[in-house]
Every structure is written in C-alpha cells, then in structure tokens.
Amino acid sequence: MVRVRADLQCFNPRDYQVELLDKATKKNTIVQLGTGSGKTFIAVLLLKEYGVQLFAPLDQGGKRAFFVVEKVNLVEQQAIHIEVHTSFKVGQVHGQTSSGLWDSKEQCDQFMKRHHVVVITAQCLLDLIRHAYLKIEDMCVLIFDECHHALGSQHPYRSIMVDYKLLKKDKPVPRVLGLTASLIKAKVAPEKLMEQLKKLESAMDSVIETASDLVSLSKYGAKPYEVVIICKDFEIGCLGIPNFDTVIEIFDETVAFVNTTTEFHPDLDLDPRRPIKDSLKTTRAVFRQLGPWAAWRTAQVWEKELGKIIKSQVLPDKTLRFLNMAKTSMITIKRLLEPEMKKIKSIEALRPYVPQRVIRLFEILETFNPEFQKERMKLEKAEHLSAIIFVDQRYIAYSLLLMMRHIKSWEPKFKFVNPDYVVGASGRNLASSDSQGLHKRQTEVLRRFHRNEINCLIATSVLEEGVDVKQCNLVIKFDRPLDMRSYVQSKGRARRAGSRYVITVEEKDTAACDSDLKDFQQIEKILLSRHRTVNNPIEDDSDRFEEFDVDSQMEPYVVEKTGATLKMSTAIALINRYCSKLPSDIFTRLVPHNQIIPIEENGVTKYCAELLLPINSPIKHAIVLKNPMPNKKTAQMAVALEACRQLHLEGELDDNLLPKGRESIAKLLEHIDEEPDEYAPGIAAKVGSSKRKQLYDKKIARALNESFVEADKECFIYAFELERFREAELTLNPKRRKFEDPFNYEYCFGFLSAKEIPKIPPFPVFLRQGNMKVRLIVAPKKTTVTAAQLQEIQLFHNYLFTQVLQMCKTGNLEFDGTSNAPLNTLIVPLNKRKDDMSYTINMKYVSEVVANMENMPRIPKDEVRRQYKFNAEDYKDAIVMPWYRNLEQPVFYYVAEILPEWRPSSKFPDTHFETFNEYFIKKYKLEIYDQNQSLLDVDFTSTRLNLLQPRIQNQPRRSRTVSNSSTSNIPQASASDSKESNTSVPHSSQRQILVPELMDIHPISATLWNVIAALPSIFYRVNQLLLTDELRETILVKAFGKEKTKLDDNVEWNSLAYATEYEEKQTIIVKKIQQLRDLNQKSIEDQERETRENDKIDDGEELFNIGVWDPEEAVRIGVEISSRDDRMDGEDQDTVGLTQGLHDGNISDEDDELPFVMHDYTARLTSNRNGIGAWSGSESIVPSGWGDWDGPEPDNSPMPFQILGGPGGLNVQALMADVGRVFDPSTASSSLSQTVQESTVSPPKQLTKEEEQFKKLQNDLLKQAKERLEALEMSEDMEKPRRLEDTVNLEDYGDDQENQEDENTPTNFPKTIDEEIEELSIGARKKQEIDDNAAKTDVLERENCEVLPVAINEKSRSFSFEKESKAINGRLIRQRSEEYVSHIDSDIGLGVSPCLLLTALTTSNAADGMSLERFETIGDSFLKFATTDYLYHTLLDQHEGKLSFARSKEVSNCNLYRLGKKLGIPQLIVANKFDAHDSWLPPCYIPTCDFKAPNTDDAEEKDNEIERILDGQVIEEKPENKTGWDIGGDVSKSTTDGIETITFPKQARVGNDDISPLPYNLLTQQHISDKSIADAVEALIGVHLLTLGPNPTLKVMNWMGLKVIQKDQKSDVPSPLLRFIDTPTNPNASLNFLNNLWQQFQFTQLEEKIGYRFKERAYLVQAFTHASYINNRVTGCYQRLEFLGDAVLDYMITRYLFEDSRQYSPGVLTDLRSALVNNTIFASLAVKFEFQKHFIAMCPGLYHMIEKFVKLCSERNFDTNFNAEMYMVTTEEEIDEGQEEDIEVPKAMGDIFESVAGAIYLDSGRNLDTTWQVIFHMMRGTIELCCANPPRSPIRELMEFEQSKVRFSKMERILESGKVRVTVEVVNNMRFTGMGRNYRIAKATAAKRALKYLHQIEQQRRQSPSLTTV
C-alpha cells in the first residue's frame, strides 16, 4: 500500500491573492489582508473582471461599480490608484464635491454615464440610495473599504447592507467585496473570535476568506513536531559576578546623564547621543539576557565602533567629548569584567555565567553531532543539521553567534556546527546603503545556508517573513512567540518531514506561553477550517484515501522505449515540477489550475476533475478525467496522470518522463552561447568565438589560375588602364611636383591570359601622382607570342619582381614559368592607341630591359666619363642610380627637376666642404669631369607597395628618406645624423641633389616605374574581386537557379570606392558618439549645405561611405582623482555597495575582523541620507538606479537641497552643485520631442539676491544636520517585522443594540466542500450570463486591418527601401542610357556587385578601406528577424523558452561559423593587412618551401561535436583533463564557497592577439578566428538585403543552410483564436469570450492610442495576456508574440538607423541600436501609451512593480533621458548585486510593447510597412531624441574617461546561480563590481557604477571649483 506524503498530493497552490480574487468574483467575500497593497490589488482586479458590464452603455445592460470608503481623504487616493491600473473613468464623490450631483436625478444620471467606477464616501452613497437617485440593482460591484465598520448599528455600511439584503430576494444584486485588515488579534480568545467573525459575515452578507501567506504556510507547510523546553529563570544578580553592582551603576548613571543633558541645542548642534544610547542599551541588554561573558565581548566591539566615529570626522569639540565619555564607559565596563571572563576557555567554565536557555540550546545542537547520533542514538544514517535559531533582537543574534564560534573553538564535539547570522535592516530607511549592505550580506549568507556551507543560522524575525529559506529540520524559537504571525511564520520554516520546532521558555513565563500556544493552535484551526481551497483539497472530507492502494485505481503510464513508469501517486508532483519549468518572470509562479466536479451516480457522489496547465504550455485545452473517482484526491491524481501522458506525447516530457526544462537547454546553450565570456582573458576558446583561430588556405581566382600562356597559341591581352580622379594631396607632395595623368601615357602595363577573364569593377589605388582608378580592359584583338618572345617576356616579368620591386630578397620565392604557379599570368608593357583603345605588346621595350638587366647600375670606365656630355633630355622622366655607392643594394631615384643654375662647382651646403667637387674628391676619390653639367633634384622611389590606401600624412619620415640639411645634396648613407634634421627642416626645403655624370639611367622610365610599384596592389585587388565575382556566380546559380551570370558587354560594375581621410572630412560618416553629439549641435542648414556640396564630388562619382572605424586616440576627459587619495585611504576602497563600517561579513575569531552590523554610524555621520557624499567612497556607489534624486521632491519647495557630508564636515562643493542644479534653468531638459507632455510642475520662481540664497542655505544645512542625527536611529530593541500587520479588534466596532434582522440571517458559511463547489460554480455562471448580455455582439468579425490617421499623419515612413539601399550607393551601373530599372522582387539582375561582396568579406583587421562591420550589424539583425519569423511559423505549439533556444542555436556564431566553413567562405575572407613582401604570392612565383602548418589536433573534433549538438543529438559529458593549458599562464583561478574566481593578469604593454601559436606559411595560409567567419556570413546576408531586398535574401540564406521562410512557401498562419472551449451547443463560445475580454479591457481605446485597427482581434488580446492570467483560454499568453516582436523591432530600428543620412560607423550603430532596442525603452513607451491599463494579468508582485514604474515615468514626464543610468546602453537587463528582484523596470511592460509589434506584424499579413508606420508613430520621439543625444556604451565611455587607469581585474562566477561578477579597478584604488548573467553584462554594469561615481566627482569639481571650505 502506498502512503503518500501530503505535500506531494496537492497541486502547487496559487498565490493566495489570486485565490482570493477567484473567490471574490464568484461569491460575496470579506478579504482580510495587512495594510500592504494586497487589498487594493484584489479590488482593482475584481473591477477589471467586471469590465464587460462596466463598459457597456447603461441603456444596454451596463452597470456601475462603487468603491465605498470611510473617510473623505481616502476618496482621491483610491481613485488615483484605480486610474493608474485601469482604463475606467473614475468619479469621486464626497460631502465636499460640488459636482451638482444632488441637484437633480438627471445630473446624477449624467454623472453615472460619464464614469464607470465611482469612489464615494459611505454617507453619500447611503443618501443617494435613500433619495432613489441610485438603485442597488444597477451596480455590479460594491467594494467596502474597512468593512469591519458594518458591525456598528448606526454606521452607513450597515444601513446599505440592510437595503441590499432586502433586495436580494427578488432582484439581481451586485457582488460585494469587503476589505479589512487582519481580524485576528494577537490576544483574542478563540471562542470570542469565532463569534465575532460570524457577526461580521452576517452583517456583510459575505464569507470571510482567510487565505493569506500565514494560512498557506499552515496549510501547505509540513507539520513539525512541537516541543516546549522549560528552563530555569536567569537572575543575573544572583550569579555572584565580581563588580556586578559597579557595572550596573555605570550603565544607569551614563544613561541618565545622556538622557538629561541639555548641552545640545536641537537646531544648532550635531547631537551624538543616539549612538551613545545604543551602545549602552545594547550592552546592558546583552548583560541582562546572556550574561557577563557576552557583555564583555559586546563592550569591546562598541569601544571600537565609537573609536571609529571619533576618528572619522572633524567633529565639534562638544560632540567629541560626549563620544569620548561613552567610549570610556565601555572601556571601564570591559576592564571590570575582564579578569574573570578572560579565563573562560570551555563550555563548563562558561556554564555559571549564562542562562540555562543557552546551555539547553547547545544540548539540542549536540544531538546532531554525527558521532553522538551513531553511538548514543544508534542511528545508522546520521541526520545532518539544518537549523534556524530565532531571536528577537539583532544584538542578541550577534552575541549568540560570538558565543557559538568560541564554544566551537573550545569544544571538539561542536566542530560540526557552522554558524552565521542574518538580521534585517532597521526598517527605517531601506534605501540607505547600510541596509543594502545588509541585504547583500543576507543574500550571501542564505545562499551558503542553501548549499549547506552553513548549517546553523541565527536570525531575527526577518526570516520569519517570507525570505525563502530551504527546508530545515530544526527550528528553535529562543524567545517565545508573542503573536500569531510570529508563531506560524517561524514554525513554517521547519518544513522537512520529521523536523522539530522547539520553543525555549523560562519558568516565570511558562503559564503565559502555555495559554498563548493553546490559543494560537485554536486560531490556526479556525483559520484553516475557513480557508477551503475547494479545488485543491489536502485532506478529503469523504474518506481517508490512504486506507487503500491509490496506484491500483488506474494503470501506471509506461514509456516503452525506456521503461520509465509513472504511477498515479507521483503524477501530481511531476505536474508541479513541469509547471515550474515553464518560462515566466521572477514575479510569476506558474501553477496548474484544477477543478473538481461532483457527479451523482446511483445515489453515490463521485468526482471528476479537469486540469488546466499554465497558458504558455503547448497543451491549451482542459484535460478532463473520463472515469469518475470515489473521492476528490484520487480524481486529482488521475487527472494529473492523464496530463503527464499528454505532455509526454507532446514532447514536453522526455522519455524518462522528466520535464525538458531550462537546465537541459542551458547545458546545450553552453556549447553554442554567443560566447558571453569571450572577451574575458584566460578563458578557453569555444567554437565560434573570436578566441578560437584556425588556419585556412588562401585562394587564387579560377580565372587567374587558368590563364597560363603557351607559345604560338592565341591569348588575351588585358590592360591596366589607370585614370587619375584626384591630384595628390598637398601634404603628400610638399615640393609641389607636377605629375601627368597616366591615362594620357602612350603606354601602360597589362598581362596575358589564355582564358577570358570576367568583368570586374574598377577600383582605386593611391599613387605618387594622385589617386587612380584602375580599370581592367581587354584588348579588342587577341595575340600570339613565339617561344622566343615568351622567354623574353618571362625574363622581363621576373626582372620586375626581383630587381625593381625587390620581392625576392628574403629568398622565400622562386620564379616558375610553368602552369604550376597558383597565379600564372605574365606581365607585359603595352603600347596603346588613344583613338580606338587598342593595345599591343611593346616587345622592343621588353628586349631593351632584358638586354640591360644583369648589370645595373653600370659603372662607366674613366675614359667614357671624360667624354661625357650632359644632355637634359636623357634625364627627363628618368630613374637614376648612383654607381659609386653600395652596389649590392642599389638605390633608385626619380629625377624630379633639373637644376640649370647648379654646377659641380656650386657652393656645397655643408661647412665641411667648399664645393661639390671637393666633397666627391675627399669622400669618394672621384673627380667630376664635366663642369658644365646641371645638377639633378631627385626623389626616392617609394618602397611602399601597399597602395590600397593613401599614404598616411604628416608622419615623420623614416631616416633614410630625409637628408641632413648640412649635406642636402647627397643622400645619406648612414641614418645616424639625419634624425635631428627631421624636426628642424621643413619638408619643402629638403632636397636631394645628385650629379648626372655619376649616375646610371635605368631603362624603365619614371612614369612606368610608378605604375610598376602599383602592380602588387593591383593584382591583389583583381584577385579579390575575381574571387567575389565567383561567389556572386555561385549564389546566382545555386540560390536563384539563374543560368545567365555574365555581364553584358554594354554594362559594367560601378567602381569600388571607399572613404579615405580626405573624403571623410568631406562627408558625414559618424564614427564616434561624441562626433554625433557635436554634429547635432550644428544647425540643420549647415548639414544641408554640406550635403549639397558633397553631391558635387568630382567625376560625378558617388562615394561609398562605409564607416571605417578609426580607432584614433579618444580625447581623455581628465579626472585627476589622485589629488584626493589621502582622504580615501582610511578604509578599504572595495566599493561594492557595502558601507565603510561593514567589513566583509566573514566573521573570524580574531576580534578585529568582527563586523558589528548594528548600524554604520561612520557612514551616517559622513554622508547625507539620500544624497551622495563626494568622498564617502563606498556610499556613493550604491545603485539607486534612477538618476540623482531618490525621494519625491518636496512639492512647494523650489530647493531640493541635499546635505552632503564629506571627511571635512559638510561638502560645500556638492552643495553648490545642488544649488546650481535648482537655480539654473538651463539644466531643465529641453523638450526635444513634441510628443512629450509638458511638465506639470511649475518651474521655481527666480530668487532675488544671492544673500537670500545663502541665508536659506544655512538654515537648510542646520535643519538637515539635525534631521540626519535624528535619523541615526539604531533599530529598536525588538526588531520590527518589515510588514507591520494591522489588526482590527472587532469588539471595538460592535454595538450593544444588535439589529433584529441579524438573527434571521442564516450564516453564509458553507458546511462542506461540495456545497462550496456548488456555490462557486453558480456565482461564476451568473456573472457570465450578465457579461454576455452586456457585451456588444456586433463586433464579432472584422474584414480588414487598417492604420488609423493618427499614425498616417506622421511623416509617413514606409519600410520598403529602394532595392539598392541608399546606404550603399547602388553599385550596379548600367549604361548611361538606362537610368533606372524597376525593382520587382523577381528582378535580381546579376546579383550583388563584387565590390559589396568584397566589403562583406573584409575584416577590420585587414586595415583596408572597407570593412564588413556595418553590413554585419544589419545582417545580424535581419538574420535574427528571419529566423524568428521562421520558427514562429513552424514551431506552432512551442513555448517561448524552446523558441528562444532554437533561435539561439540558429543564429549563434558557432552555427554561422559551421555554415560559413562548409561554403568555403574562410578562403575568401580578407583577414590580414596586405603586405606585398611577406604575405603575397606574385604571379608566376611559388614559395621555395612547401611547408604548410596544420590546425591543432582537436579542431576537427570540436567542429564535429558542435555539428552533433546543433543537430540535436545528446552529447556525452567528457571528463575534462586539466592540463593547465586551457587557461592562460598568468590567469589565476580558484574556487571557494561555490564562487569560481578568475583573476586577470595586468596587461603587458604589448600584446598581439593575432599571432598564431605555431608558425605557418604566410604566403599560402591565413589565420582566421571562427567569429570572423560568422561575421562574414552575417555581412553577406546584410549586403544581399541592401542590394536585392528581403525576399531574394531569404533565398540566399536558404542556400547558406539557414532555416528561413521562402517567399514561395505559403506559411499557413493558424488563427490566433483557440477554440477549445467551443461546444456543439455553443459553437461561438470562444468568440464570445474574446469579445468579453475585448470589452473588459477596452482594447478599442487602445487601438485609437496606437493608431491601428486589428482585423484579427485575438492577436491584440494575446499580446496583452500575461502567463499568470489563467482565465484566458482563447488566445494563450503573449510570450510567443513577444519573441516575434522583439526580432521585428530590432530589425526595423536597426534598418532605420542604418539608412540614416548620417552614415553611422559600426560602433555608433551598435550603440544606438542597443540604446533603442531594450527593455527599458520599450517599457517606458508602453507606459507612455498606457498599456498597463489594458494589461491582462493576475500577478501581485508585478502589479506593484508596474505601479512604481508608472509613477516614476510620470514624474519624469515620460522623458527618455538616455544618459540617465536606467537607459545606459547594455545588451540585456543586468542585475545589481543582491538586488535581482529589484530590477526597477518591469520586464512585462517591455514585453507587451514587443508583443504588440509582433501582433501588428502578423495581423497586417507580415507587412513590415504597416508595422513600421505604427511603431514609428509610437517611437519617433524616442528615436529622434536618441540620435540627437546618443548614449554610449559604459565600457567604452569608462575607457575614454580614464584611459590609462582602468583595469578589469577579476571575474567571479557564482556556481549555483551561474551569474558572473566582474571587478573593475579605476585609478588603482577604487574598485567597483557589476553582476550579470554573463561576463559582458557584468562588465557593463561594473563600468556603469564606476562612471556614475566618476561623473559625480567631475560634476562637483566643475560646478564649484572655487569653493573648498565652508
């Protein structure tokens, strides 16, 4: 027989508030909840549930709701609350209203017509009813606040309810909800209580519901074994403590003195008495309660604390004297107790000095010692201790911990106890930093308790209240429970089966304790008997089902494949587990919803059950039990078993019958995550990351590889036609040389090819003569060459590369004239004819060069020289070589100018030599014979072979190119002395003068030489463009099935063009956020003028501006913090949100380290309450999350001053900063967007004179100083619970004269669960009928969707961009005649231009003129969008968790890398800078060694593993062998307390990440990271999208292997309306229900706001339905739509930014995108358009959070300040430490904004145009604002702010939660931490915190530089 544990047999309970709401809709209910906002939550949601009746017009069955309050001041408060959360019009009525309501019934009717809900005082309502202005039957809901007043016989509540009951017999009456605080007083006799509850129920005609957190604890918590231990009284006076009287006397006298002193004037002095009183009070209390030993220890701690306060401040003398007095008292007490106490070193020695309660406590703990359990208790398996000890006061908790730690160190038998303590903050100021510090510490301690690192927790009541703690097996209430709440809460902590709940009580309190406990237990029974969870019974009324075998009732479910078996008895637990694994936010606990249906069979009642799973589960329909069961419990189990069966068939449970939850997904994601930690140094590289690099072969274009020319066979001649499009920059031509355009030369270079070569676009190269456009032109006629000619050509070709270009100096290349060379074309000089552009090979020239090539330079014989006659013609356009110098490495010069006035006899510029003649004789022993020759002014031939970018200007030249001015006629051979000249001689005067007679003239002319220098760059580019052309053809054939891929003869590609330095100045490419900010300052006319000028760039050529992100040094904003460092040294600056007084919280036995977390006075005296002290180090870092000002600003005061304390007393700088902020009207945000509402707060009046300001300032200072000292309150002795329970004593409200009618009223309290089930279902049915009548049925179907005028009137932005996006300046030129070709989708022309493909394959590492980054951004966004669209439409019943997982897998870098590698993309990628000498293989050359490095061994294996993971196979976990290689050498890694810490090394100055670990062959291989391949795939998507449009791009993505919807695939979108509730009798049930929801939540109103009318209204309802709203079974929740909408918004916004006329560089684009596409922005917009009023949810936590957020947004006027911390750029919501639950922005609000976008997209038939119109209407202001005042990434900003002084020093991964904490160090001594889901987010958070602090310091400095002292 199976006995089932009670907690496994019931479904997880719903939130008690939801439970209450459910009852309140179905029957009249009185709800009793504490003062929190729990009550209002239920009231507002009840009103929403009745929305259908309330919104219907009164003449069509509509009704009204009344919220009745006691006092006038509550009317407005409740009305505002209802208005924030609903779209009801709320009227307010009380005695003072002058609404004319009383004048006539017509007036009253008009008022009722205008308002749906009326908040009214009781008396007014009664009067209106009595005067027949209102009828009770016209109301649908009647809510009474503080309904216990109905017990008073004369109270209006009572009178209204009397009328109500009279009507009830024959008219429909409204639903009544009574709200009251707790009715259970701490000290009320149970019998009395019962009687009073019945009276109230009768008066209100309602049932009191007792569901609350307390009752759910009692009901669902395990029942522990309760024990009371009676101990001897502790009489401290009788212990014979030496010096006892003296000690007591010191206490009394000091306290008396402090209390009676009149020294401190309340308005003028800093009063230190609070901390002094606390120190005395706590020490004395410890002395009285725990004895002298504990008091001795406490006195030591206080002595230290007071000492700190004394040291910490510059305090007035009087204050100091007082503090010193207190410190002396502590020292005296310590000294008096020390002699005896110091001796104690064992528990026995301690025994006489402590109460028996403490000794008993240790005896109980000892029973958990494993050895004790084995030996004395004879237990086989030891039970591990997991205990909580509750005490009332914080300092008792602290002293008890000290005692435990010492006893543990004295007594080995207590070694197994690992204690710690948690206390709550004092409850006064929860925002203060010390409570945040405490909160953080509390989180940490509880986490360690969860993981059993701590097994004994000493706690104050903070833990009694809802802080989630794991189940314990021992709870000790050290101080007896004094009220019901304390009893139930503490008992509820003992949740483990067989746990013990122990109360220790002294003899004197025994009687009181006994009677209290009896009462508590009685009351608990009463409450439980009244709290029926009808559909989820724990005990069954009918019979105890444990008597028989449950599992025999129904066959177990068995999975054939694995043999996994599920029995009936365990099914419920599995359903609970499954629900908890569904995706939901932190506020929502998803639980199943079940209903029990009694059925009569042959006079016997049996039970059926139906189960509804949460609405985001794929199973949306109700799971119904076919065969009834004998009792309710078995019915529940059976329906759960059926549900599990269906879940398994749906694939929601795996074959082992376990939920496929987040864990398994997370495991898989680990392999493919977007490498969150990839930038963290020292973490092993994953597949797809930027860290993992591999080697790939470089590819040569097919056309160039197959172009080998054979003798006597026809071949093509290709000419390189150079045409200058811009003169050389003046900076690059300082001597103002004149250059001719190569286009006008009569000769040029080309090459021979056996095969025809495809057309490629022209491209630029940057020569000495200027910027050239290179065209590859084929000669009209083919040619043949003979074998002899071919040999000569090969020699010429070899000569160019070896001698002229010096390519073979390193000996790594050899010439290969056969077809073996990878690139085998031959270079030839060509003659060209201008008229018909025909080209012929200039063989004469070839022969001439070949004849002279061996012996250059030729040294002439002496007699030849004597004959030498100078002929100027020979030297024009010549290259000369001095033959008298180093012949091994000849130097070549261009002859720039012939100087006729210079002769060899001219004066030599250097003082050492008279003339040139003398110089040559002395230096070279050479005599110059021709004395009449002119000298030559020459320039160096450039050795720069990378001409793809213009030469960098203004850099000091290398030593060999500049001559020393003293010998400016001779080129320097030695570099040593030329260096000084660089700086002293202006460029233009540096001339190099040579003597013609001593030169040899090279056969190659200067102009051709120039072109030869360009050949490596030209060939390199031609090869690239041919490769990308091959890719274009492949895509046309394979993706589009095209046959024609060649360009027609009359068509050519547009030129490759990219912004170079000069052009960037001419056009707007926004590279830096700062630049954008500056640009925005310029007037718009300026911009327009500039744009007009840009359009006129010469040659009519449009420039293609892909922002080349130029990492030039960012300007540092100097913040020199070091000047103040001495002030900060006092404390450890580990600024992580803890205040200075709280140390690290790891208490050890050394007293020095004890953190006495009573209160941190130090911080309080240094800093203000809600401002930021300039130097209060850690205090400043506390994240408030919302700009500067915490509290609401005082209404009337124009000066929200804060008092800022600093180490020198008051911080006047900051004060002045504040004054500035208030008085300077210019700081008010200029209203940039017209949509922002005007501020409702009027600006402060200008104050007259500065003196007045100062007067006021002084008064304020004093006043606030006083307030601050008052706020230094230490917590009370008894720590108050955070949530004070208000209780109502019903006796106070009853009258003596009982009204007669009460006697006759039957009690409303149902007798059995069955009766209650019946009552509830009748209530629900009635409401439904009235709803259906009230709902208008004429809006069932709509024909079309439409965009409303409000959205069209926006400067309508269509989302269809021209096919060739302006952002890429369309690249396909057709012949000029054909201006524009229409862009219908089928017309993809010839695909994407090779230029664009090349850009998409060029990484930023290549330092080329273009890079893929911009395209990658848009491609990434489109990829996410297309994948999301596909998944949404194919995985129709998967919830958002699975969709997100599938998307992550698809768009992960790891998957893109894998696909890219399969397509051969790596061989096409340009990943490194072009270096002609080292890494380029010239035509007809092969490497001398054929070495080829392999990839690392495991690369292949890792790739295969990822392949399997992405295909969804299960991966065996391999044990990782730690080799020490997977982590960088300098990184230290350690794991302690479940936190893995990686400390990053200090970065060395030089570090090159790109260096391959192994040598490889640079000529044939390149080293590329996996991420670069993924990026290139995204960029290719981007460039196709921009050129061809979305549909063709989807085809390309499909070819790549990505899963996307094809245009021609018709994706059937099923209707969003789910029809599970339709029945044959009511075929339109679901439509009617949808209709009701539509009315109830007023979606027509919402449509007007957003400017779009839905055709399929179910989409909109779904978009607003939260997972917690179980009632909506007709559309499901918004999670899937949110998943879709997120991607739609991301793509649309990214595309919009991309197309902006200010071409944003990739970095700016990414920053703007992150700033606009994030939860905070979306949530703010949702609130701006009042989405929360239509939000369909039942989730208390979320409800309160939304309320806070709405308030915050309205205070800000819905102004999106992107630089406020809340809007700072981060990719996802990051988490502040210890505040996971405190994320200020309710994610659900952002989610519904996204789901609305998804809904519009689907409803409009997946039309982005329509969607963008509506979204742009809503977002326009925000987008424009963001571009006008762009935010920047916090990490980037921090690096620029403190460039050299920022270091991210360590990363900690909290193993349990997987969260990451990162520490950043700024200026060496300030540390900030950030926390997040992964390294990237955590790093951003840390940077944010650091920035926040630095900005504050900077601001204070800037605003008050002159103020340094008060």
Curated annotation (Swiss-Prot):
Pfam families: Dicer_dimer, Dicer_dsRBD, Dicer_PBD, Dicer_platform, Helicase_C, PAZ, ResIII, Ribonuclease_3. Belongs to the helicase family. Dicer subfamily. Residues 970-988, 1227-1245 have a biased composition (Polar residues). Component of the ERI/DICER complex which is involved in processing amplified double-stranded RNA (dsRNA) intermediates during small-RNA-mediated gene-silencing or RNA interference (RNAi). Involved in cleaving dsRNA in the RNAi pathway. It produces 21 to 23 bp dsRNAs (siRNAs) which target the selective destruction of homologous RNAs. Seems to process the precursor of the small temporal RNA let-7 which is involved in developmental timing. Required for avoidance behavior induced by small RNAs derived from pathogenic bacteria such as P.aeruginosa. tDCR-1 acts as a deoxyribonuclease (DNase) initiating DNA fragmentation during apoptosis, upstream of nucleases cps-6, crn-2 and nuc-1. This is Endoribonuclease dcr-1. Residues 1381-1589, 1643-1805 form the RNase III domain. The record marks K1787 as: Important for activity. Residues 1245-1280 form a coiled coil. The record marks D1537, G1538 as: Cleavage. The avoidance behavior is transgenerationally inherited, and thus progeny display this same aversion despite never been exposed to this pathogenic bacteria. Residues 1272-1286 have a biased composition (Basic and acidic residues). It comes from Caenorhabditis elegans. Residues 951-988, 1227-1248, 1272-1309 are annotated as: Disordered. Mg(2+) binds at E1682, D1791, E1794. The keyword Zinc does not apply. ATP binds at L33, G34, T35, G36, S37, G38, K39, T40. Residues 1833-1896 form the DRBM domain. Disruption phenotype: RNAi-mediated knockdown in a cps-6 mutant background reduces the number of DNA breaks in embryonic cells undergoing apoptosis. Residues 1288-1304 have a biased composition (Acidic residues). Its cofactor is Mg(2+); Mn(2+). Component of the ERI/DICER complex at least composed of dcr-1, rrf-3 and eri-1. Interacts with pir-1. GO terms for molecular function: ATP binding; deoxyribonuclease I activity; DNA binding; helicase activity; metal ion binding; ribonuclease III activity; RNA binding. Changing D1686A: Loss of dsRNA dicing and DNase activities, bursting and protruding vulva and reduction in the number of cell corpses in embryos.
